[in-house]
Amino acid sequence: MFGTATRDNATRVLLLGSGELGKEVAIECQRLGLEVIACDRYADAPAMQVAHRSHVFDMLDADALQQVIDLEKPHFVVPEIEAIATSKLVELEAQGLNVVPTANATRLTMNREGIRRLAAEELGLPTSAYQFADSYESFAAAVETIGLPCVCKPVMSSSGKGQSVIRTPEQIEAAWQYAQQGGRSGAGRVIVEGFVDFDYEITLLTVRAVDGVHFCAPIGHRQEDGDYRESWQPQVMSENAIKAAEYVAEQVVNALGGYGLFGVELFVKGDKVIFNEVSPRPHDTGMVTLISQELSEFALHVRAFTGLPIGQIVQYGPSASAAILGQGQSQNIQFNGLDDALSIPHTQVRLFGKPDIAGRRRLGVALSRGKTTQEATDRAIECAKAVKIHY
């Protein structure tokens, strides 16, 4: 039973993180009459613009997080980012707080070490070779053990921050320093991963709901500087590869538990899949589902965590998304070229409403459909390029 937003009987959803993904979750909550409270470390974040109320605080501050939860008394706490005081969520969940999908899932996936050890060591799933290091000396030793080339990442970061590929011994020290600068909560532990030989990588959006585990069509994507540039759905895969991907994804989401949508990242080589990472929430590459599916990843997430059935996931056909990236300094961002962008057949644009930019930032996404995923991707890229950003 749902109450009515703004009334005493409201069903309240507290978003921890209010970026573009949180904004779409907030909109889907609004469609079900839920009361939305959006939180982030800065004011006027995208989800705050479509929420009933908002709070600005450092979500790594356990005391501040406790205060907001005590004030709002949410029925659902929905993390959108990794940088949260997850130990506090675990503590509060034990007292009856409903954390989506679970506090333990949020804790394990907030850094790469927890989820990698779960997948490889507890579940026995295929992953790249890896070692962890928390000093330069142990890092250099890990690189020697794994061998070159290898990948270095902070255990806690997103959007490619702090990630680099080490190809020569001369790059080792610089990779360590870069990882220390790129961690979400400051300098600290890193993972060194062996290079994976793969044909392509996918995101398999997997929904754990009251009526079972459901899979969206696989999403292919292209990364640059550790961040997604384009994604498309469906990614063509062999039947055996799809079965292997669904098996790995189901093992992971069942181990994490709870209800919600998970973005399971996998490398694919022929019929074989290798687990990479998982987000217990909507995924940036999944923004393509805003145009490719009857129910977007955001609608699926909200349905799942509120205990509603998913039923059949309907995919409309070849579709794609392309990030609209800004590079500059401004607190008064403006856009034009939308008339040109939207004159391209079967395209849509989402501008996120981010209040400022300092460097590189994703400010929107272009969406398109086509007869093939290549046609859809080409249209999405053309659409994104047509949007001009003024700083």
From Swiss-Prot:
Mg(2+) binds at residues 265, 277. Pathway: Purine metabolism; IMP biosynthesis via de novo pathway; N(2)-formyl-N(1)-(5-phospho-D-ribosyl)glycinamide from N(1)-(5-phospho-D-ribosyl)glycinamide (formate route): step 1/1. Its EC number is 6.3.1.21. It is an enzyme of class 6 (ligase). The keyword Flavoprotein does not apply. It holds the Pfam family ATP-grasp. GO terms for biological process: 'de novo' IMP biosynthetic process. Involved in the de novo purine biosynthesis. Catalyzes the transfer of formate to 5-phospho-ribosyl-glycinamide (GAR), producing 5-phospho-ribosyl-N-formylglycinamide (FGAR). Formate is provided by PurU via hydrolysis of 10-formyl-tetrahydrofolate. This is Formate-dependent phosphoribosylglycinamide formyltransferase. The lineage of its organism: Bacteria, Pseudomonadati, Pseudomonadota, Gammaproteobacteria, Vibrionales. The gene is purT.
